[in-house]
Amino acid sequence: MDQSQDLSVSRLANAWAELQAHARDGSALDSDAYRLAFADPEFLLRRETRGIRFQLEMLKPDLGQSEQGIESTVVVFGSARFPAPETASASLAAAEANLAKIQAAEADSAALLDAKDALMVAQRYTRNAYYYDQARLFARLVAEHSNALPLADQLFICTGGGPGIMEAANRGAHELGAPTVGLNIVLPHEQSGNKYITPSLNFKFHYFALRKMHFMMRAKALVAFPGGFGTLDELFEVITLVQTSKAKALPIVLFGSSYWKRLINFDVLIEEGTISPQDLKLFHYVDEPQEAWDIIKTFYQL
C-alpha cells in the first residue's frame, strides 16, 4: 500500500477495523479460513510462518528509522541493573533507616540478616550508579556534536531500550534534544521502553537475533559499559563479526577498565592460542566519557 494512501479508503481497512474491534470489545472475527492472511494472528504465529515474522521484524524498525533519517548510530550496551544516582541514594537511605529500626527493636536474627543484605545491595547500587552518570555524560557528548550537523551527518544514540545504562544513554542525548533509539526485547518480565527514547524510535522485538542485527545495521561505534550476560552476548557478537570481517571495522570501546579486566582475562586466550595478539586491537579500554568519544572522533576524523 502506498504510504500516502489513506487507510480509511483502502480495501485493507476492513481487515484492520475488524482486528481493532475484536481487541476493543471482543467483536467476533470471521472464521480462520476466511480471514485475510495478514489479518489472521493465529496464522502469523504458526511455526511455519516464522520466516515471515523474521522478515517483518527486520523490516519494520528499518523503515521506521530510515523514514526519520536515522542512518548512523552509536550503540551503548550495559547493565539494566545500574540505577540513576538519585534512585540509588534513595534506596540506600531507606535501607539504612530500615536496618537502624530493626536493630533498635532488637528483632530476630533472620530479620536483621535480611536488613543487612538489603543494605549491601543498596550500597552496591550506589557504587554502580557511577556508571549510569558516565553513560549519560558520554551520550551528551555525542548529541552535542551531532546537534550542530546536518541530519545526514549526525550520530544518534541507540540502546536496548531498557533501564540502567540503557536509560542513562538515552537520557543524556534526550536532555540535549537529540532523537534517541531504543531496541526493546520481549522478556518474561516485561520490559517497557524507558521514557527518554523518542516514541517513534521505540521499537520492540521478539527475536534476539533480529534485534542484534539492528544494533549492527547502523552502528558506527559500540560502547559497552559494565553488564551481565546480555551485555557480554552483544559485545562478543560484535567483536566476532569484526574479527571475521562479517562487519566493517568500527570503534569498540569497553568503558570501565577495572571491571572488564577483572571479568575477562584476554591474555589467557592469547597464551592458549585461541586468538592472536592482533585481536586485542579490536577494542579499547577507557575510563572517561571523553576518552570514549575521542576514540570515535579519531577513527572517523570528526
Put a short name on every predicted segment:
Residues 2-25, 31-35:
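N-terminal, charge-rich interaction modules
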Residues 21-24, 28-180:
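Glycine-rich beta-alpha loop segments
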Residues 66-69, 148-152, 174, 194-196, ...:
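Solvent-exposed alpha-helices and their adjacent loops that cap or buttress functional pockets
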Residues 91-93, 174-175, 237-242, 268-271, ...:
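Short, solvent-exposed amphipathic alpha-helical segments in soluble enzyme
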Residues 156-225, 229, 236:
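Phosphate/pyrophosphate-binding betaalpha-module
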Residues 177-190, 239-262, 278:
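Short, acidic/small-residue loops that bind anionic groups at enzyme active sites
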Residues 220-239, 250-258, 288:
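Glycine-rich anion-binding loop/nest that anchors nucleotide
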Residues 250, 254-302:
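C-terminal functional extensions of proteins
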